[in-house]
């Protein structure tokens, strides 16, 4: 072979490229994972420049796992949705020692052998899931709603703490972790943004999330993100592990960063001591933490311990006591919500609290104001409940000067001037008008929200524009909009208008459960909406249901039944439902007649495993739940059925061991007539 002019022969280049990649990977690991660099920044830069020059001269030698591929590729048009192999549950919270002891007691009652624990700091960052095949990084996704996240592969490549190649070529590995921005990096980033005239990030978590959700990976690459990993979600081609401490060690041995502050605890007393230590020393860490994560160490006990609908019973998050600050109440304002509730808010002199600047705090309702004797002009102690929502905890009455003024809730709605009322047994004061514009606008915002009709681009600002232009007054009006009507509005234009109309059109297929939730009926949340859709099968049957029939449905109590009856009794609401039906929104569950969907899996606990080729996991779960199934994430003796897709792993093996019936994806589709 003839060498290219001015450069080494391809064979020599390939050898040198391999050497450089290995050196750079090792130095990345020492610097970003071990925090113990072996060479200077200048020497590191020299190695990287040499690699980039060689790869530019020999593009045929560039590979996806080369360190050069971290610099950031072409901007993305949008993030692709990714179905998670395993549902990513959130953790229940413990706020004191008693909660931890209660968690320990419940776990031991369900377990069939003694338990120990693993405890580590709960980093306040963005949850990410990494996938590796044959030891090579192939995909990264955000948590999303726990079932479906967003593909952030190109962005995660730029995080140098994340290995693009593992130290062993394991056939298949999926891990969960947390990406974060160190405190010092966060401070520098905000200084740069302020100098550039850009808005500063409120906290490191927002900065990490904003960095990883950049459509341009080069922006992500410019921000020094780090990550720690803590869960093996899927493993194939390697010996499994029996304990969480072994799982963490395996991750570390593979080259993935694992928190060095993790600790093995033999007893709940040891757990409590460690949580107390970090409660006092949390600010010593170079990153923000908002608590500690406590996990049962014995992985074989997880199926016995089980899960609730939202969280596992084998792990819990110990939340630190909220931080507090003192500031002054400059004013008290009120806002009308979508159900007419008028909520007071304290306008505060800005103060730093738990890493963010706080200028407002919720006062919840008039009773809270009276109980705490809060006046305009008072100095107050504020805290963040869960370090998230600011609230006024108490008043420093010794600081009063006599110039403070008491606050009284309005007797009429501040938006429409209709009378307000307070229902018996409730603290909330409500506007009594069904035509209140503030309620209607908040209702439109809720209707378009992600968990409801998921109309992208229809946030508060756009709703306000449409309202002020007289184009919408209720959700049905949205489906009469045209791009020609929307384009002339402020900050819209032809492209934004076309995108909005397309998003509104796409929302028609969201399904009955989403529509019921989107209507904003008081007390009817997502879970209740799904239950009602599954039980009645159609909007028409739901509207016809009597109070007794509603209360006969599991999870629907007297208050919710009464709320549903009241809402459907309003002629304007029924007329709006008719208009939505005319516009083509789904008013029935799929394949539902008057009797609803056949309850093929009624009373059965079903586990999905492997990769489904025809359906995504969320759709399969929806179809199962519509037909009466309870979908679980792990196989146990209580499992009735396992549906196995391609590359099904340990769950399938366990199902075979327990003699649990197994269906292929094709069998499942045939059973529900979806072939």
UniProtKB/Swiss-Prot annotation:
Catalyses which reaction?
A: NAD(+) + (deoxyribonucleotide)n-3'-hydroxyl + 5'-phospho-(deoxyribonucleotide)m = (deoxyribonucleotide)n+m + AMP + beta-nicotinamide D-nucleotide
What's its EC? 6.5.1.2
Q: Which cofactor does it need?
A: Mg(2+); Mn(2+)
Q: Under what name is this protein listed? A: DNA ligase
Please name the SUPFAM superfamilies in this protein's record: BRCT domain (SSF52113), DNA ligase/mRNA capping enzyme, catalytic domain (SSF56091), Nucleic acid-binding proteins (SSF50249), RuvA domain 2-like (SSF47781)
What is a GO molecular function of this protein?
Answer: DNA ligase (NAD+) activity
Q: Which GO terms describe its biological process?
A: DNA repair; DNA replication
Q: Which SMART domains match?
A: BRCT (SM00292), HhH1 (SM00278), LIGANc (SM00532)
Q: What does the entry list under GO cellular component? A: cytosol
What NCBIfam families is this protein classified in?
Answer: dnlj, PRK07956.1
Q: Does the keyword NAD apply?
A: yes
What are the BRCT domain coordinates in residue numbering? 596-675
Question: For binding Zn(2+), which residues are annotated in this chain's numbering?
Answer: 413, 416, 431, 436
Source domain of life? Bacteria
| Residue ranges that the Swiss-Prot or TrEMBL entry lists as coiled coil | none
Active-site residues annotated for this sequence: 122
Pfam families given in the database record: BRCT (PF00533), DNA_ligase_aden (PF01653), DNA_ligase_OB (PF03120), DNA_ligase_ZBD (PF03119), HHH_2 (PF12826), HHH_5 (PF14520), Nlig-Ia (PF22745)
Q: Which UniProt keywords apply?
A: DNA damage, DNA repair, DNA replication, Ligase, Magnesium, Manganese, Metal-binding, NAD, Zinc
Which PROSITE patterns does the record cross-reference, listed alphabetically?
A: BRCT (PS50172), DNA_LIGASE_N2 (PS01056)
Job description of the protein: DNA ligase that catalyzes the formation of phosphodiester linkages between 5'-phosphoryl and 3'-hydroxyl groups in double-stranded DNA using NAD as a coenzyme and as the energy source for the reaction. It is essential for DNA replication and repair of damaged DNA.
């Amino acid at each position: 072979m003839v060498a290219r002019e001015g450069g080494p022969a391809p064979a020599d280049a390939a050898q040198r490229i391999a050497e450089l990649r290995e050196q750079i990977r090792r130095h990345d690991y020492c610097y970003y994972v071990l925090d113990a660099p072996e060479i200077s920044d200048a020497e590191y830069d020299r190695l990287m420049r040499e690699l980039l020059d060689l790869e530019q001269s020999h593009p045929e030698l560039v590979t996806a796992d080369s360190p050069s591929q971290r610099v950031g590729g072409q901007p993305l048009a949008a993030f692709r949705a990714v179905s998670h192999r395993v549902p990513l549950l959130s953790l229940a919270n413990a706020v004191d020692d008693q909660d931890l002891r209660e968690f320990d007691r419940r776990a031991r009652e369900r377990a069939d052998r003694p338990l120990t624990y693993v405890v580590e700091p709960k980093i306040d960052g963005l949850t990410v899931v990494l996938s590796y095949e044959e030891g090579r990084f192939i995909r990264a996704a955000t948590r999303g709603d726990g079932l479906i996240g967003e593909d952030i592969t190109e962005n995660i490549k730029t995080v140098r703490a994340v290995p693009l190649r593992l130290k062993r070529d394991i056939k298949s590995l999926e891990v969960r972790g947390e990406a974060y921005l160190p405190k010092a990096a966060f401070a520098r980033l905000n200084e740069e943004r302020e100098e550039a005239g850009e808005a500063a990030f409120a906290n490191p978590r927002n900065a990490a999330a904003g960095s990883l959700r950049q459509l341009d990976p080069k922006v992500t690459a410019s921000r020094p993100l780090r990550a720690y990993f803590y869960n093996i979600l899927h493993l194939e081609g390697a010996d499994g592990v029996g304990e969480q401490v072994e799982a963490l060690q395996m991750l570390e041995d593979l080259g993935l960063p694992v928190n060095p502050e993790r600790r093995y605890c033999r007893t709940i007393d040891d757990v409590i001591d460690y949580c107390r230590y970090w409660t006092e020393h949390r600010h010593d860490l170079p990153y923000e933490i908002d608590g500690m994560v406590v996990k049962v160490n014995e992985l074989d006990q997880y199926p016995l311990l089980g899960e609730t609908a939202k969280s596992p019973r084998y792990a819990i998050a110990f939340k630190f006591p909220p931080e507090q600050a003192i500031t002054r109440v400059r004013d008290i304002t009120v806002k009308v919500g979508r159900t007419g509730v008028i909520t007071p808010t304290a306008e505060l002199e800005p103060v730093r609290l738990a890493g963010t600047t706080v200028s407002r705090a919720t006062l919840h309702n008039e009773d809270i104001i009276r109980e705490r004797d809060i006046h305009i002009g008072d100095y107050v102690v504020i805290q963040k409940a869960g370090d998230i929502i600011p609230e006024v905890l108490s008043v420093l009455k010794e600081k009063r000067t006599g110039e403070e003024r008491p606050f009284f809730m309005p007797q009429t709605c501040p938006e429409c001037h209709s009378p307000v009322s307070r229902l018996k047994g409730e603290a909330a004061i409500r506007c009594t008008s069904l035509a209140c514009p503030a309620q209607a606008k908040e209702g439109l915002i809720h209707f378009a929200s992600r968990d409801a009709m998921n109309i992208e681009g229809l946030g508060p600002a756009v709703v306000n524009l449409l309202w002020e232009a007289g184009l919408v007054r209720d959700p049905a009006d949205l489906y009469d909009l045209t791009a020609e009507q929307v384009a002339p509005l402020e900050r819209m234009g032809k492209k934004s208008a076309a995108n909005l109309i397309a998003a509104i059109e796409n929302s028609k297929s969201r399904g009955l459960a989403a529509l019921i939730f989107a209507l904003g009926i008081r007390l009817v949340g997502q879970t209740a909406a799904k239950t009602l859709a599954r039980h009645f099968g159609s909007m028409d049957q739901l509207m016809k249901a009597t109070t007794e029939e509603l209360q006969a449905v599991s999870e629907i109590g007297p208050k919710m039944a009464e709320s549903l009856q009241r809402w459907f009794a309003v002629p304007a609401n029924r007329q709006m439902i008719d208009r939505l039906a005319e516009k083509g929104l789904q008013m029935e569950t799929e394949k539902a007649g008057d009797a609803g969907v056949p309850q093929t899996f009624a009373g059965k606990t079903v586990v999905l495993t492997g990769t489904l080729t025809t359906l995504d996991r969320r759709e399969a779960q929806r179809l199962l739940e519509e037909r009466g199934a309870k979908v679980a994430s792990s196989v146990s003796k209580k499992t009735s059925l396992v549906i196995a897709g391609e590359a099904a792993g340990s769950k399938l093996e366990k199902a075979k061991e327990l003699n649990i019936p197994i269906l292929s994806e094709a069998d499942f589709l045939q059973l529900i007539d979806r072939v």
